[in-house]
Structures are given as structure tokens and as C-alpha cells.
Amino acid sequence: MGDERMKKRNGFTLIELLAVIIVLAIIALIAMPIIFNVIENAKIKAMENSTYGVIDAVRMQYMEELLNDEDGTLTLEGDVDELTLSGEHPNGGTWEIVNAADVTTGRGIKVTDVTFASMAGYKCNNDLTTGKVTCAK
């Protein structure tokens, strides 16, 4: 009679359920840092793209002033509201034209310590040799 009750068992024991929960917790502990790293890298790439947008906007404003027969001096005085930007607007940093001959490629425009509200503590800079923008803490 005792053997019949053991054969009709349809559920899981508490130990089996705890084992599954422990395995899932271990998988979650391994996966969480990877997921957070992917999210952080995506935000950094978005900041870099927004910085490229600042460079393009400065380039376009500079070219527009040249076409309007102005002296080629672009003075923004830290205010980006004059620029038509794609992406997030920066809330700090400097951008200057250091080589007018390379403005058309964007490599004549130096950006230094550009910051964005979405990623506090990060600053973006560009390398005039390669034209690449990097953002870091």
C-alpha cells in the first residue's frame, strides 16, 4: 500500500524547487554585469554620436558664415542654441575651429570636454588626426 502512494506522485519536492531557484540565481548573477555593460556601452555610443552632431553643426554654421561673406570667425560663446543639432544637446564643453582648411571634413574642429545631461561624469573629446570621438569618465 505504501508503494502505490509513491508511484502516483505528480509534483516536485521542495529540494528540487530550491535547486532550480539556486541555478536561476547563479545564471542571473552571471548575466547582470554583462547586461549592464551593454547598456553602458550603448549610452556611450549615443554620446559619441551626439558629439559628432555637434561637430557637424559647428561645421555647417561655419560654412554658412563663409557663404554669407563674413570673416569666417564663428563665435558661439558657449551657447549651442544657435546651432541646428541632431541628437542630444550638450550642456558643457568647448568646440573651436583650429584648422580652417580641414573644416569641411570635420577634422579642423576640436571638441573638448563636451558633456551631456544623460551621462553625468562622462566627457567627450575628439582626435583631430583620426577624426574619432571618444567619451570616458
Q: Language model features by range: what are they?
A:
Residues K8-I35:
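N-terminal single-pass transmembrane signal-anchor helix
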